[in-house]
Design a protein with these regions (language model features):
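Surface-exposed beta-strand edges and their flanking turn/coil or helix-capping segments
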Residues: 40-42, 54-57, 74-76, 111-112, ...
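Charge-dense, low-complexity intrinsically disordered segments
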Residues: 3-7, 65, 110
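Oligomerization/assembly interface segments of phage tail-like spikes and tubes
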Residues: 53-71, 112-125
Length: 131
């Protein structure tokens, strides 16, 4: 049986979403010190092994913009791209992706920006281990 370990899903999503949408900057934690409108923060918040070869990853996605309308627009684009990842040719093989509806979520770390947040779950193969 081939053993696998989880991948760095924050980096995988950051890389793949940035390749699909160049109008935003995508980050994994920590929050960048120069956070600005158009930034998207992707943070793993949980997950589980779903088979001998695949893992499920729960992530939180924060979309920052200058105002509420722009934050909604940005989160709609990122949400749509994320759930479409299994249908796209990306650096990571996603077998499933779903997400809940984005919601307004004030961030005290960035009071000058509006933020929309959504949770998502993606499933993809792990990294093969050689033992």
């Amino acid at each position: 049986m081939q053993l696998v370990s989880p991948i760095d899903i924050e980096d995988a999503l950051r890389t793949d979403l940035a390749a699909l949408y160049s109008d935003a900057r995508f980050f994994a934690p920590p929050i960048p010190p120069d956070l600005k409108a158009g930034d998207v923060l992707i943070e793993r918040v949980g997950g589980a092994r779903v088979s001998g070869a695949s893992h499920e990853y729960d992530v939180s996605v924060d979309c920052y913009a200058a105002n509420d309308a722009a934050a909604v627009a940005l989160s709609d684009v990122v949400h749509g791209l994320l759930v479409s990842l299994p249908l796209r040719d990306t650096s990571t093989q996603y077998s499933a992706a779903n997400a809940n509806t984005p919601y307004s979520n004030y961030d005290p770390r960035a009071p000058q920006l509006a933020r929309q947040t959504f949770r998502a779950t993606v499933i993809c193969p792990g990294t093969r281990l050689t033992i």
